[in-house]
């Protein structure tokens, strides 16, 4: 299904199914592209209910007609949740919508199942951590979804016996976690911008910064998308270390955190590119439009005024998420909850300018919240 002919002639509307952190990322970039944002979530207290232009609270599985009706006034529908039942349902009714669904369901089923993903990596010769190594340290992770819950390093053989059934056991590969998004239209695949994923002790991401072009990583990511004939978006994660690149997972769904860093460092809006994948098609990227620096991070304010890095697991427990402060090169979002969590975005022509803006942003938190910076 192609986009409506009125595309570009009026304010475009995107309907997001999911009101948590993936939804926030997609809503943020949709607004940057000048779109009207509708969010649908069955939770009346959905985290981004107040950030959306329109919020509709209903269960799409129980009341699908409401979603079909909303699709009549939307240019596209984008699932932004990892609820298996919800994704399966959207897959079963995808032909009933009046607008395109910006999602590759076939690629998602492979990417969601980490065992299937590893078989896929092996089938096209992609380097990946060794399965069930003979001796520790081991890295264990859940078999499904992109969650970091339960992921950890194990140094003792005995601990392996007490693992939850189905957990994946791999060699522990030392290095940095790097990420790269690819958007495909089924025939052409745009590899976008490398980012460094800064993780905490629970393997949850608390900061994202851009990286220079990595030809090997780009080539591997392109192959992963091309061999699936990807029509949609896919996030490729790897460990970059002394042993070279090892691909740890793919996720064929709209990511959170990295797209904002990609937007400010490269000038590419992944939502706009995703729309093109289902419309006029995408072009493979020879040169990125911009080469800037961006710092994207989450900080929680403690009672004593200290700011500590936190990941999405903490953020997702919030009650409301939205804009707090904005000026050129600085954006601050506030996630209300038991303790306030700030998402800070700083960008500039280089690392130094972004760093100066970070200092200013932190001083704003000091003035307004008494944060110790």
Q: Where do the protein language model's features map onto the residues?
A:
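ATP-dependent carboxylate/phosphate-activation module, predominantly the ATP-grasp catalytic core
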Residues: 171-229, 240, 251-278, 287-291, ...
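Peripheral (often C-terminal) accessory segments that flank ATP-dependent C-N-forming ligase machineries
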Residues: 275-373
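Active-site-adjacent "lid" and substrate-binding segments of diverse enzymatic cores
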Residues: 230-236
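Active-site regions of enzymes building and remodeling cell-envelope glycoconjugates
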Residues: 50-59, 99-100, 138-140, 167-169, ...
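Conserved protein kinase catalytic/activation segment
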Residues: 244-246
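Active-site nucleotide/adenylate-binding loops and adjacent lid/helix of ATP-dependent enzymes
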Residues: 108-177, 184-189, 195-200, 205-223, ...
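Short, hydrophobic beta-strand segments that form beta-sheet elements in well-ordered domains
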Residues: 16, 36-41, 77-79, 128-131, ...
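ATP-binding N-terminal substructure of ATP-dependent carboxylate-amine bond-forming enzymes
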Residues: 1-104, 283, 347-350, 357-373
């Amino acid at each position: 299904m192609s986009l409506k002919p009125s595309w570009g002639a009026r304010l475009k509307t995107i309907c997001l199914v999911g009101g948590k952190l993936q939804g926030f990322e997609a809503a943020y970039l949709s607004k940057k592209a000048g779109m009207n944002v509708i969010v649908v979530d069955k939770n009346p207290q959905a985290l981004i209910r107040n950030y959306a232009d329109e919020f509709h609270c209903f269960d799409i599985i129980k009341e699908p007609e409401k979603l079909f009706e909303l699709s009549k006034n939307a240019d596209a529908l984008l699932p932004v949740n990892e609820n298996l039942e919800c994704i399966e349902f959207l897959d079963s009714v995808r032909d009933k919508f009046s607008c395109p669904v910006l999602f590759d369901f076939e690629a998602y089923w492979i990417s969601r199942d980490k065992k299937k993903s590893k078989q896929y990596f092996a089938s096209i010769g992609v380097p990946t951590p060794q399965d069930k190594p003979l001796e520790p340290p081991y890295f264990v992770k859940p078999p499904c979804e992109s969650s970091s819950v339960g992921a950890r390093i194990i140094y003792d053989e005995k601990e392996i016996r007490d693992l939850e059934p189905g957990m994946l056991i791999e060699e522990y590969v030392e290095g940095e976690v790097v990420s790269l998004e690819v958007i495909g239209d089924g025939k052409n695949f745009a590899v976008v911008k490398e980012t460094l994923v800064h993780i905490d002790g629970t393997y949850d991401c608390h900061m994202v910064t851009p990286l220079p072009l990595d030809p090997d990583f780009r080539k591997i990511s392109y192959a992963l998308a091309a061999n699936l004939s990807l029509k949609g978006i896919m996030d490729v994660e790897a460990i970059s270390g002394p042993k070279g690149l090892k691909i740890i997972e793919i996720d064929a769904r709209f990511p959170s955190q990295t797209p904002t860093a990609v937007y400010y460092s490269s000038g590419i809006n992944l939502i706009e590119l995703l729309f093109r994948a289902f419309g006029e098609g995408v072009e493979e990227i020879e040169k990125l439009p911009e080469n800037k620096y961006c710092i994207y991070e989450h900080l929680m304010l403690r009672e004593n005024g200290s700011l500590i890095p936190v990941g999405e697991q903490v953020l997702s427990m919030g009650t409301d998420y939205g804009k707090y402060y904005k000026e050129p090169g600085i954006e601050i979002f506030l996630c209300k909850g038991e303790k306030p969590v700030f998402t800070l975005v700083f960008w500039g022509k280089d690392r130094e300018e972004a760093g100066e803006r970070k200092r200013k942003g932190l001083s704003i938190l000091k003035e307004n919240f008494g944060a110790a910076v």
